[in-house]
Amino acid sequence: MGQIVGYDHAIVGAGLSGLLLAKALVDSSARATGGRPPATRVLLADPRPAGRLPVTFAHWVRRATALDAWTVGTWDRLAVVAHDGQTHRVALDGWTYTALRWDRARAALMAELAAHPRVTVVQAPVDAIRDGEASAAVRLAGSWETARWVYDSRPPVPVAAGTRGARRGVNLLQTFRGVWVQTQDEAIDTSAATLLDFSADDGPDLGFSYVLPVSPRLAMVMAVRMGEAADLPDPLPAVGRVTGGSAWEVVGEESGTTPLVVPGLSRRLGRRVLAIGRRGGRARPSTGYAVTRILADTAAIAASLDRHGHPMAVPPDPRWQQGLDAIWLRALIRERAALEPAFLALFTRAPVDAVLRFLDGGAGPLDIASVVRALPPGPFLRAAAEQAGATIRR
């Protein structure tokens, strides 16, 4: 007698990738059964309560997405500010830069899934995953639960440079701290979101701020730093450029740390286990952008299940893209002073379509050629030579 499998799908982690995938699975099953109760059984495990901390995501889109209900601001122009304060504005040519409140979205999606008759939500960590031939299992709260397919979205573990299994051997941290600022007067310019502002950062690592002006009296000012230290940057020096001399107060705060890691392992972690989200390399290693890639990956997994009966037929990232990510990260480490001109060049010398696809990881060869032509060659040639040497030594 065969083993009884408790679930069709077990999703480890209820972050962006886990929740979007869970919703896509039950929605797809409902469509397949013609509106009757779906047959798919989903287990969703995460130790974190819903909506615990405020989190705002920003990304660019061309069409409607499953996250639109939680949008708090949209812009069709971006601003890039140099260290000397000079501002460059860029029209997005059909793209829309969108800010969404992920804490609100997560709370709503968690509630929707928890109320679904075919979804089991468990607030507990998964401390082990066991692969198998016909099913896999996850261990949570001291017991094993079986599923036909397991999706692991737990945070990736950085692989130290030079160790066995390190494909590229480059790891950095992206730390960020932001404040929601409310002004007394209608003093905030909402015509463009500021993607990169280098004018208020003098730290040793690459640092900048970005601004999401959601109304004439309310904006998110976020300071970002990319380096090897985990210290949180200070967003307050950048507030003055946003408030225009008006009195202001902080009405909310956000902070966090994201590893910028070039993945060293296959997404297929076993016969029945697939890495998703950041663990599956869906955050662009060289930039940290993830939302657009996770939306696309969710659709690809659902399509693989529909067409092939398994979730593994998802397109891999090209090897040349992984190589570019490693070179970009090495340049961030070694060439901090040269990286500000590089970022500015992206938005002043390359087509915006190519730049946005490059930052999200969806660029093709022609996009890459446009980006490479726009960048100052010195820092990246030196980083490429160093990366090539590291690869040869391994």
Put a short name on every predicted segment.
Residues 2-43:
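N-terminal Rossmann-like FAD-binding beta1-loop-alpha1 element of flavoenzymes
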Residues 23, 27, 31, 111, ...:
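Short, well-ordered alpha-helices that flank and scaffold nucleotide-derived cofactor binding pockets
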Residues 24, 112-249, 260-265, 279:
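Predominantly flavin-linked oxidoreductase catalytic cores and closely associated redox partners
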Residues 24-28, 35-85, 104, 177:
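N-terminal FAD cofactor-binding segment of flavoenzymes
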Residues 59-135:
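A conserved beta-strand/loop capping segment in the N-terminal third of enzymes
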Residues 201-206, 256-275, 281, 285, ...:
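FAD-binding beta-loop-beta segment adjacent to the flavin cofactor pocket
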Residues 263-329:
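Conserved mid-domain beta->alpha element of the FAD-binding
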Residues 302-394:
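C-terminal helical "tail/cap" subdomain of flavin- and related membrane-associated enzymes
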